[in-house]
Amino acid sequence: MVDLVGGLVVHARAGERDLYRPLAGSKLVDSAEPVAVVEALLALHPFRALYLADLDAIRGRGDHRPLLVELTTRFPELTIWVDAGIASEDRLRDLAALPGVRPVLGSESQADPRLLERAHALASERLVLSLDWRGEEPLDPAGLRERPELWPRDVIVMTLARVGTASGPDFARLDAVHRAAGSARRVWAAGGVRGLEDLERLWERGIAGALVATALHDGRLGRTELARLAESVA
């Protein structure tokens, strides 16, 4: 996971976005510059996908599109999942047109379920849905969590209160979404991952994977742990 504010990678914690500060103290990289952070992540492990949250765009304070174009050019081996507060067809088309980008529709940004209905035609198999919660409160004005028939193949369960806190994934909510999603969809965890044991437990429950940042930067998920995980799920 890479969270962007004002052109820099920030340390996301508990969904309190106004309190996020540029990344510091990472064991991987001594910089908050996005290119340097991505290079450090790829030096740690040959990740094939990167989740990027444009927090400026999500909050209506500009966006990082030029940086996104740079990242797709510099790292063509990566598929970049981008949550940029997509709330219109034009914005969805713009992101879907970028090579290597998978647009993420965050439920917190959706006021009308019809965009998700139309998004399947606009982004096809690249579309990702993020079902967002803050604590027990769903951030879902359009009620997408109650419309599994509209969900695309990949669904993120984003528990913002757990992001950056090392408090563990919300296994109960993940289980519920996984049941609702059915066997044709993949469910991804976001928020709270502490280390290898959590990732193994998620895999055993049928969760496809997890979005992780803090555990990578503080060293709890290092090269050895990632290699073990890759071997066990191969």
PLM feature segments, named:
Residues 1, 51-53, 81-85, 104-106, ...:
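A cross-family glycoside hydrolase active-site/sugar-binding cleft signature
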Residues 2-26, 90-166:
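Conserved anion-binding
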Residues 31-48:
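A short, N-terminal amphipathic alpha-helix
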Residues 49-63, 157-165:
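Glycine-rich, proline-tolerant flexible connector loops at the mouths of alpha/beta enzymes
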Residues 62-70, 139-146, 167-176, 227:
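Charged helix-capping and loop-helix junction motifs
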Residues 73-78, 125, 184-185, 228-233:
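Short acidic, glycine/proline-enriched helix-loop-strand junctions
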Residues 74, 79-103, 119, 144-150, ...:
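Catalytic cores of alpha/beta
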Residues 115-122, 200-234:
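C-terminal helical cap(s) of enzyme catalytic domains, especially alpha/beta-barrels
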